[in-house]
Amino acid sequence: MQLTLDSKFATYVPPKSQLLKWVGNKQKFAGQISKYFPANYNTFYEPFLGSGAIMATLSPSSGVGSDIYKPLIEIWDTLKNDPNLLVEWYKERVERIGNESKKEVYDSVLETFNKNNNGADFLFLTRTCYGGIVRFRKSDGYMSTPCGVHNPIPVETFRKRVKEWNHRMKNVSFVASDYKEIFSNAKEGDLIYCDPPYSHSQSILYGAHDFKLTDLLECISEAKSKGIFVALSIDGSK
């Protein structure tokens, strides 16, 4: 749904609920952030996709969502191309709770995931980890977030969310790549939205340990010189 405010800006309606439980997601602010986007653009790019809140809010007619972390992109790609499988991934793990304690299931899935990173395990972990904080050890890259105190949402609730998000993401392609590749692919008239790792999170996030804001700002400057629209969310207090 799109309501034009004036000739330059538009407003959008965010999804009703998050698909992934993800700390730092922009679900609450997606409508406000998108007000600053131009109403007319070609392809929408989001190179730090994360929770996908902005992409889903815009539900673009042409979009590219990317992230450096492959298991995350596996989730988004499955959402678009095989949503029923995504539900089965979640159901298979959630329904183990009852025969085993929530913590036992979580620890088991976490152990499997750390041995072989994959989207199916990562989906469950994002929805059940403590506070939605997806934390990785710098020493070995293992996810180290403990089990959360909350109960995971019911399978049918998750299924309804998948249906809505699948519809919103139907025109989006998902790729696992570095943000610099996305900038190199964008053309004049395209829009890039960047929500990079904040300074206080760079010690715990996947792919964030070597991130340099100065490099991103150089990419943004070059993109703008080519007639590409760029929007940036940044931790101004740091």
Roles of regions detected by a PLM:
Residues E188-K238:
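Conserved acidic-Pro-Pro-aromatic motif
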Residues Q2-F29, K35-A39, D82-Y193, P197-I204:
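SAM-dependent nucleic-acid methyltransferase catalytic core
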Residues Y36-I97:
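Conserved S-adenosyl-L-methionine
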Residues N40-F44, S61-S62, M169-S173, K224-V230:
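Short active-site oxyanion
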Residues A56-L58, I75, N185-A186, S203-Y206:
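A short acidic (Asp/Glu
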Residues G31, A56, K180-S184, L217, ...:
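Amphipathic, non-transmembrane alpha-helical secondary structure
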Residues S66, S177, S233:
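The conserved SAM/SAH-binding core of class I Rossmann-like methyltransferase domains
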Residues I68-Y69, T126-T128, D235:
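Beta-hairpin (beta-strand-turn-beta-strand) motif
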